[in-house]
């Protein structure tokens, strides 16, 4: 139920040494997405609304894990994002045990090219404020598994998997030595997996020292939205996932 904080991960400072003098840089960021859902889902030909806020998702959550990472050398780099969530609580209705479960996995991977960095101030000797722009390309794999087990009745389950190509861009603003802003967007699907998918992310981060290296960690937060419109099958076998997931994000980015 809950994709890429990678839009925040590669917040490189304009004060750092030139790209040609750097080796590989690696960053990893565990995070949490306080997600809500809006849209509709069709399963076995039956359509239903899924307008759900984060409080309901939290109540139904069994386990979740989210991490993003990236690496860069010079102008080229690669990034990834992994999300897994297991939802559904057993309950008894009229003396009958009902066990619904939903498992969701998103795995995103791709690359980026640094188009350039431009200073936004003429202050002598200052590397900030500045803006860095990257072009993004990659793919997102989506796995959905729903299971409904009703005591005394047949178990019903549904599995869906698809892969969406993605293209996008991000702008990374170094506002000061410690503060930064990120704007990220991508589109994809194009009928390969989803008919269409899009993502937007706006975040702000604060750099600080962790262990012995200066400014090697950042607390990052913001707001993220992802839309997917995926269809498969027809008639009583039709499945459709026309859903927007959105909500605040909060994470800790660490340079390795």
Where is each model-derived feature located?
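Predominantly the C-terminal beta-signal and adjacent terminal strand-loop region
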Residues: 200-256
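Residues on the lipid-exposed face of transmembrane beta-strands in outer-membrane beta-barrel proteins
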Residues: 28-30, 67-73, 109-113, 137-139, ...
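Transmembrane beta-strand segments that form the barrel wall of outer-membrane beta-barrel proteins
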Residues: 180-195
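Outer-membrane beta-barrel translocator domains and adjoining extracellular loop/strand segments
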Residues: 39-47, 90-95, 123-124, 145-154, ...
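Short glycine/proline- and aromatic-enriched beta-strand/turn motifs that initiate or cap beta-hairpins
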Residues: 13-84, 249, 255
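Residues that define the transmembrane beta-barrel architecture of outer-membrane proteins
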Residues: 22-24, 61-65, 72, 103-107, ...
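Transmembrane beta-strands of outer-membrane beta-barrel pores
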Residues: 32-36, 73-75, 82-88, 106, ...
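Short loop/turn motifs that connect adjacent beta-strands in outer-membrane beta-barrel proteins
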Residues: 15-24, 116-132, 175-179, 209-217
């Amino acid at each position: 139920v809950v994709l890429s904080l990678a839009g925040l991960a590669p917040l490189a400072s304009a004060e750092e040494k030139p790209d040609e003098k750097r080796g590989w840089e690696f960053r990893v960021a565990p995070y949490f997405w306080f997600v809500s859902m809006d849209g509709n889902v069709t399963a076995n030909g039956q359509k239903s609304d899924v307008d759900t806020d984060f409080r309901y998702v939290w109540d139904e959550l069994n386990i979740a894990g989210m991490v993003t990472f990236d690496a860069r050398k010079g102008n080229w780099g690669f990034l990834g994002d992994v999300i897994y969530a297991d939802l559904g609580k057993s309950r008894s209705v009229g003396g009958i045990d009902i066990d619904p479960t939903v498992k969701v996995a998103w795995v995103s991977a791709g690359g980026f090219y640094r188009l350039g960095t431009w200073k936004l101030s003429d202050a002598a000797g200052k590397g900030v404020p500045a803006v860095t722009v990257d072009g993004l390309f990659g793919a997102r794999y989506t796995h959905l598994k729903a299971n409904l087990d009703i005591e005394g009745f047949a178990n019903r389950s549904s599995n869906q998997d698809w892969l969406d190509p993605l293209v996008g861009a991000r702008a990374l603003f170094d506002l000061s030595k410690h503060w930064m802003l990120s704007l990220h967007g991508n589109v994809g699907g194009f009928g390969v997996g989803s008919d269409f998918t899009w993502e937007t992310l706006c975040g702000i981060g604060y750099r600080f020292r962790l262990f012995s290296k200066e400014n090697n960690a950042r607390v990052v937060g913001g707001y993220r939205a992802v839309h997917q419109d995926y269809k498969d099958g027809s008639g009583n076998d039709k499945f459709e996932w026309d859903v927007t997931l959105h909500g605040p994000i909060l994470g800790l980015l660490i340079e390795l």
